[in-house]
């Protein structure tokens, strides 16, 4: 599945004339993120697309990929000013994420509750994005920039 995803990303980048030589697709357990990267590994952008929204029951929201607990782990790999691009169809997850990012020292620099209403030319539609959009479900999206470590 990851090979197909990488091929789709490479094709989408090629169609827009964007080099994809530095794109890495990884399927990792966030709890083991530190085991997969060295302190020298740096990330300039992370995409979180249509992740499991996890209900708020019994504290399961801490498993959300945008929960501050997870965002703090991403921060360890990110240079100051690096970005997280996040898309979801889930209203509750998006609303909660609007507070999660600042709590973890990220500044939300762009957000929308309906990505396709005024779709930016830089948006690369994912398969899930197309599927939800065809069902009339608005796609929520944001870009968050990592602030200085002193903000956490």
Language-model region placement:
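A short glycine-rich, Lys/Arg-flanked "PGG" loop and its adjoining helix->strand segment in the class I
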Residues: 62-83
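Class I S-adenosyl-L-methionine
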Residues: 94-152
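Conserved SAM-binding loop
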Residues: 5-6, 97
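Compact, Lys/Arg-rich rRNA/RNP-binding cores from ribosome-related proteins
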Residues: 5, 64-68, 90
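A short SAM/SAH-binding and catalytic strip from SAM-dependent methyltransferases
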Residues: 31, 37, 43-65
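S-adenosyl-L-methionine
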Residues: 6-45
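Short, well-ordered alpha-helical microsegments
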Residues: 2, 33-34, 94-95
């Amino acid at each position: 599945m990851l090979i197909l995803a990488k091929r789709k990303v490479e094709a989408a980048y090629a169609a827009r004339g964007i080099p994809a030589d530095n794109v890495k697709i990884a399927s990792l357990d966030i709890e083991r993120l530190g085991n997969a990267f060295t302190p020298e590994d740096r990330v300039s952008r992370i995409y979180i697309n249509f992740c499991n929204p996890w209900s708020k029951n019994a504290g399961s929201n801490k498993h959300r990929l945008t929960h501050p607990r997870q965002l703090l782990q991403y921060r360890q790999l990110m240079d100051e000013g690096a970005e997280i691009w996040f898309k979801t169809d889930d209203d509750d997850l998006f609303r909660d994420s609007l507070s999660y990012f600042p709590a973890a020292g990220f500044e939300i620099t762009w957000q929308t509750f309906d990505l396709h209403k005024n779709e930016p030319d830089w948006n690369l539609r994912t398969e899930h994005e197309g599927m939800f959009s065809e069902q009339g479900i608005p796609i929520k999206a944001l870009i968050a920039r990592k602030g200085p470590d002193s903000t956490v």
